[in-house]
Amino acid sequence: MLDSKLKAPVFTVRTQGREYGEFVLEPLERGFGVTLGNPLRRILLSSIPGTAVTSVYIEDVLHEFSTIPGVKEDVVEIILNLKELVVRFLNPSLQTVTLLLKAEGPKEVKARDFLPVADVEIMNPDLHIATLEEGGRLNMEVRVDRGVGYVPAEKHGIKDRINAIPVDAVFSPVRRVAFQVEDTRLGQRTDLDKLTLRIWTDGSVTPLEALNQAVEILREHLTYFSNPQAAAVAAPEEAKEPEAPPEQEEELDLPLEELGLSTRVLHSLKEEGIESVRALLALNLKDLKNIPGIGERSLEEIKEALEKKGFTLKE
């Protein structure tokens, strides 16, 4: 039983960085550490929106299995490097951007070589993309989108221009989440929980921002249980039993003895509290089979007796 006198839990930010955060919530009633920690972990890993590369266009490249003269890496390696690109959209309404890169060798091409774009920040500018030899050139356009979860290349189908290569997109900015539940005490009570959450992100979203978003997502979904209007919209209509014809309505309340059943069958039904035709018709064949003493022959006897009165058992 929940203790109404237990003071409100205290939320503490133990560690907060751009890519790692540790948070503590205590004291909690016994069991609530796991009750809160597990869904928050799942939401953090699956449902926090982020950004990812969704397509790549490279000048003079027809497909991802090509090679580029004067470039050490093949196209597959370049795309794998680009998938590690971490981009932060500073404008919440921004949904997609195209990053442009033009480079000539000899040169090590890094993420910092993309041309600047308003409201866009590259979080890992030292990311290696390609190595150009003397005379090598690399001109590319990289599309970055905002999204949620994992979307394979064939699903999002983004192809802004001919020869653009779609890329599998992992949008989640949360790299890893761990939670730990430990015993804690408050006064004389020693049976309380302390929940510790550790969150790692790619830096495009801070751990605290990710946690706040996860809490809002969980809160929003929990309101569906307490909002009667939402429940009324979502709930399917209850199936209504067809009304019996007026001439049969009176017979529904007849005692079972009026059906002319054998003493053995009648006794088995009455042992289960079935006293009337109406109560018998509320059961289906499976229900009747589960009654001790009611076998296949007894079922046939019951069905025939009901049919004589114009009734049929539910399957």
Swiss-Prot record:
Protein name: DNA-directed RNA polymerase subunit alpha
Disulfide bonds: none
Catalytically driven reaction(s): RNA(n) + a ribonucleoside 5'-triphosphate = RNA(n+1) + diphosphate
Source organism of the structure: Thermus thermophilus (strain ATCC 27634 / DSM 579 / HB8)
Enzyme nomenclature, EC number: 2.7.7.6
Subunit structure: Homodimer. The RNAP catalytic core consists of 2 alpha, 1 beta, 1 beta' and 1 omega subunit. When a sigma factor is associated with the core the holoenzyme is formed, which can initiate transcription.
Region annotation Alpha N-terminal domain (alpha-NTD): where it falls in the sequence: 1-229
GO BP terms: DNA-templated transcription
GO CC field: cytoplasm; DNA-directed RNA polymerase complex
